[in-house]
Amino acid sequence: MLHTIGILIWIIIKILVIVVPLLISVAYLTYAERKVIGYIQVRIGPNRVGLKGLLQPFADLLKLITKEIIVPTRSNKYLFVIAPLFALVPSLVGWAVIPFQEGVVLANINAGVLYLFAMSSLGVYGVLIAGWASNSKYAMFGALRSTAQTVSYEIAMGFALVGVLLAAGSMNLTDIVNSQKGGMLHWWFIPLLPLFLVFWIAGIAETNRAPFDLAEGESEIVAGFHVEYSGIGFALFFLSEYASMILISTFMAILFMGGWLSPFEGITFLDQIFFVVPGFVWLLLKISFFLFVYLWVRATFPRYRYDQLMRLGWKVLIPVTIVWLIVTSLMVVAHVKPWF
């Protein structure tokens, strides 16, 4: 009995070690977004609350927590309240299979890719439930857009994943990282470049980020699926969006960019200099790079029209992935060096 309780406590501690830094990262990702986009638009960004505005995320959190939670009169109150949790929980539980370094993973399962793909797709249920439960036309339009968008881009994302599975020969995330050993030229983003780009575009669409943020298009449907949400409900949707961004960026780093592996592996004099850098630091740097690209894309591109979004998903990305899957299969059979 005591042994079982000890194991349970240890699992809870490991979960907290992952979740608490993740929530803090989400808070400061909002700060980074406002700063980066501010600099791109030749503004300063938040600079009043704390040194250089560093306490701004906590001020925003305090503001949202203290706001009144308003539940629309004709809404389904039970579903309206739990919908934000349906959106947030998948983006948190996906971290259970993320390897931060060799052997540093909560659950090293053999179907890690499948599990993570499923978790990254489940958040759309929270959006759909929120749109329907709000009993609002704008919210429902936003929810339907988001559902159609997610389903469309999941297909391209799934095909891109198949390419990685063909190349690595495993669905275990640790094995996929280890299959990229040998330096930057051995990482999968080089032979699978079209799949890498498709996966990245689909990841932006999955997380409802600009230029694919049609689910919350301010100029068309006000705030979209969370138009009726205020206070902590809105904060949870906000949290789930940014947590999903970090999860997709981590997924990209592991599948295509060597995870925790050093880019200088195989370059003797550089490898000796950077040998002391822990693996998880390289992983964090790669995640930060993808997050920066998220913000850069948001500040650069205008929002797509709905028909353009669907056309890109069905008529461009899916055919590209199918063609490159055939090419990847041929490269695997031909044992093209240095990857296969």
Swiss-Prot record:
Function: NDH-1 shuttles electrons from NADH, via FMN and iron-sulfur (Fe-S) centers, to quinones in the respiratory chain. The immediate electron acceptor for the enzyme in this species is believed to be ubiquinone. Couples the redox reaction to proton translocation (for every two electrons transferred, four hydrogen ions are translocated across the cytoplasmic membrane), and thus conserves the redox energy in a proton gradient. This subunit may bind ubiquinone.
Cellular localization per UniProt: Cell inner membrane
Family recorded in the similarity comment: Belongs to the complex I subunit 1 family.
Membrane protein topology class: Multi-pass membrane protein
Catalytic function, reaction form: a quinone + NADH + 5 H(+)(in) = a quinol + NAD(+) + 4 H(+)(out)
Keyword terms of this UniProt record: Cell inner membrane, Cell membrane, Membrane, NAD, Quinone, Translocase, Transmembrane, Transmembrane helix, Ubiquinone
Species in which this protein is naturally found: Legionella pneumophila (strain Corby)
GO cellular component: plasma membrane
Protein name: NADH-quinone oxidoreductase subunit H
TM helices/strands, residue ranges: 4-24, 78-98, 113-133, 151-171, 184-204, 244-264, 273-293, 316-336
A single GO BP: aerobic respiration
Top enzyme category: translocase
UniProt GO MF annotations: NADH dehydrogenase activity; oxidoreductase activity, acting on NAD(P)H, quinone or similar compound as acceptor; quinone binding
InterPro entries with a match to the protein in the record: NADH_UbQ_OxRdtase_su1/FPO, NADH_UbQ_OxRdtase_su1_CS
EC number: 7.1.1.-
Subunit-structure text: NDH-1 is composed of 14 different subunits. Subunits NuoA, H, J, K, L, M, N constitute the membrane sector of the complex.
Superkingdom of origin organism: Bacteria
HAMAP family assigned to the protein according to its UniProt record, in alphabetical order: NDH1_NuoH
